Amino acid sequence: MRRIRVRSFRAEALSALAVVVSAIPLGAQEPPDTVLVGDSLATSFLGVIDSSRVADTLIVEDSVSADTIFYNLPRPKNSEPASFATGVWEWDRADIMADGANNLAELFHALPGVIALLGGDYGTPSSVTAFGLGGGGYRILRDGLEVYATEGSVPNLQLIGLAGISRVRLDRSMGQMMIEMWSHEYEDGRPFSIIEAGTGDLDTNLFRGTYVDPVALGGSVAVGLERMDTRGRGGEGTEAGNRTGSWARYQVHVGDRFGVALDYRGFSTQTKVPEYTPVTKRSDFSARAAYQPVEGLTLSAFAGRSTYGIDAAADSLLILDGSRSQLGGSLAVERGMFWLRSSYRSFEGLLPSGRIEARSGFSHHRWGGLSGSWSSSKWNDIEVSSVGARAWLKPTTFTTMFASYEDGSYGSRVGVLSGGIPSLDQHGLATEATASIADRTGGRAGVVIGLGGAALGGAALYGSADRVLPLGLELDDGAIEGTGLERNGYEGMVVLPIFLQGLNLEGSYQFWDEEAPYQPRQIYRGSFQFHRVFLDSGNLELWASLGVRGHDPMLTFVKDNEIGEGSLARVPFYQSWYMQAQVRIVTVRLWFGMDNMTLRRNLQMYPDRLLPYGRSFFALRWDLWN
């Protein structure tokens, strides 16, 4: 049996941190004072300084300061606002660090109705679901390029890193969720660094670092590195694993209106869990150009290539790999309240071979808005399409009424990426990747009432599908699709300020009249949340939370099932109590968290794939201008 060496690198991380800090000249850092420094939350909310502000600076000072020279590739920014009413959530860099998430599954699992599908600890496959969405249940766009699945029907979230990511957006649509990610955007003309290092139970260690220089090598340069390792739940490291990623980007800018970016991201995972591939890796290389001929109009073109590789078995020397490319372009229009997004993508292979889509809408901060979407793609020359619409209206300042509707067909691939190696069935025979098409319809309508910092919302839910598809990852690879079903349900949320300033009671609840694969009848979230900024300078900030995440017993897809019917098995109810705390002093963040505080020993999303019985974790997160 091949052994995978998973090293504890607590000393390495701390040493690297010490070297980085000591290598920075003290005079090159911005000394803290009574004024909030440039990389504080206030600056991140203000966003990038626009060209007019730079021009004003040049006129007033009659000289050019290096700190005022920086450019970003133009990109559209208007869309549906993030809220429970629209079903959209967003995180900026400060939000991600405050959450303490180490991957997308951890970032999303606190949201109403969202379940993280985990195969174990770090290094094992992971995914997410909402509304019972399985195969083809979500897509990922990163800097405008699609991060398509290299194996199965959805991307393995363990292979999607957060190094260098400054913003994440989740659109929790009932037909297909959309995850969008954006890499670092410059806010200042000085070099900038982010250092994150942590350690915890089960020999868990984290290091994530990012360095960006907006004026280097005739353009701008950014690099990132991250690693997470653990010995896992098993004794003597029998379930040890790690995930390691890197990122590099070079951009050439012609002012604020045109730029070209070359981007590379590589990621690999290792695990000793015998049910999973011991080594999995993917890399994504892309070239992207963006042009803004006039204010409010953005054109972009992009090309990318992804490669994927696995060790077929722990006791085998066989290495399997494949690759796939994509080409495409997009057009975006923003005029006052109106916005439009459209794109076309051509993929190597037939699963899918191409996709064209458009989204448009109106949005007003006082009165609300409406939006619509359309998408069409080809799977083995079969055209599938879907449409969606949503509205959120504010008849009063404290009331928001909302509704959304999605209907269409959605493609899902079974097997590895097109153009790569074929899948191996249970008899060791090669099988070509195939496509499954599912018809889905979903609707949601409700109201949110907010007054004086308190909010109460609820919505009626409807969902139907002609079939339910497995993810196609190692989590349920080989499972047979389930029969369709029609369900009704409702969900609610509450935010209630209580006796202490900055302290809220927050919660969400979702109920369905019938369970389904990846959709338990009840899902609940509840927590006490504290967030407050102290001192007039704003240089002291505190977050704290104590809560619970849980759901009823759940049906999951499995390949070899002995306890359920067909390809379905039932796992016990899930309940995990947790706490988190973070204090920010100027730009240094000290973070502490505990998961599964009650030490429940049968937490699982798949039969016999037990999750860690408890973990406390401490991390230092520091961003600084160099």
Predicted features, each with a name:
Residues 29-99, 185-190:
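N-terminal periplasmic "start-of-domain" segments of outer-membrane beta-barrel proteins
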Residues 65-89, 105-146, 182:
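Extracytoplasmic beta-strand/coil segments of soluble accessory domains associated
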Residues 145-172:
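Short acidic/polar hinge/loop motifs at secondary-structure boundaries
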Residues 175-180, 186-246, 256-258:
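Outer-membrane beta-barrel translocator/receptor signature
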Residues 186-191, 215-219, 254-259, 292-298, ...:
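Short loop/turn motifs that connect adjacent beta-strands in outer-membrane beta-barrel proteins
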Residues 197-201, 227-231, 264-270, 303-309, ...:
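Transmembrane beta-strands of outer-membrane beta-barrel pores
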Residues 237, 255-328, 349-355, 373-381, ...:
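Flexible loop and strand-edge segments within Gram-negative outer membrane beta-barrel domains
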Residues 612-626:
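Outer-membrane beta-barrel "beta-signal"
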